[in-house]
């Protein structure tokens, strides 16, 4: 198993450079509604950008989110289904898909373009679960070291209770499993709308200081106003 220390040091250094680690003031959390608040105008724009199938994908996605929100089922069933449904999006590296090395797509961009990488899957699952009623405190987008891939990776961790072992939603597998069963993943840091946690250090500041997150939120706001 690769040592965690070098990866953790690099992650902490990056967060320090971004101003995340430290006693930062809490920022307003992101409102619910981004995931299904897709207007006809936005669908038209993304159809022009990503092709005629974009509209079909976005309409189907909105229908699914609305119907799933009203459907009965256990918490675990919801996690399994959301993980499986969004994993159907094709995996595409950022450089090939967006022409950038590290681009965090909005859920509407990922769905309409039918392309995502690990961050994009995680972001889409996060916003969809939040819209379906999952409390923000239970959700953490989590950077890990993937032992299998030997590279950085992102997953969504779901905490049924504050002191509970998290369940892992991963684009690499449809099955949702407890973190203790994912020995192939070494956690580095995690965040949600409200806070950042660095492994072995605990709470470390506000996610608004993470550049890619701030850029993503700005694009989500523009989508909502379209």
Q: Where are the predicted features?
A:
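A structural boundary/capping signal
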Residues: 21-226
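Bacterial N-terminal signal peptides
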Residues: 9-19
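Bacterial N-terminal signal peptides that target proteins for export
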Residues: 1-11
């Amino acid at each position: 198993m690769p040592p965690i220390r070098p990866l953790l040091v690099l992650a902490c250094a990056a967060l320090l450079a971004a101003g995340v680690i430290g006693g930062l003031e809490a920022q307003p959390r992101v409102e619910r509604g981004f995931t299904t608040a897709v207007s006809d105008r936005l669908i038209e724009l993304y159809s022009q950008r990503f092709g005629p199938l974009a509209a079909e994908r976005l309409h189907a996605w909105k229908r699914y989110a609305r119907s799933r929100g009203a459907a009965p089922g256990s918490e675990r069933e919801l996690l399994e289904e959301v993980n499986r449904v969004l994993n159907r999006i094709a995996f595409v590296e950022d450089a090939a898909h967006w022409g950038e090395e590290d681009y965090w797509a909005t859920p509407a961009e990922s769905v309409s373009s039918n392309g995502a990488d690990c961050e994009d899957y995680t972001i889409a699952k996060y916003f969809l679960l939040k819209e379906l009623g999952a409390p923000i405190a239970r959700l953490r987008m989590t950077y890990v070291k993937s032992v299998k891939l030997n590279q950085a990776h992102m997953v969504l961790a779901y905490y049924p209770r504050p002191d509970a072992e998290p369940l892992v939603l991963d684009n690499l597998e449809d099955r949702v499993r407890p973190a203790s069963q994912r020995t192939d993943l070494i956690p580095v840091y995690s965040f949600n709308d409200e806070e950042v946690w660095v492994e072995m250090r605990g709470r470390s500041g506000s996610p608004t200081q993470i550049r890619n997150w701030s850029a993503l939120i700005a694009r989500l706001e523009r989508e909502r106003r379209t």
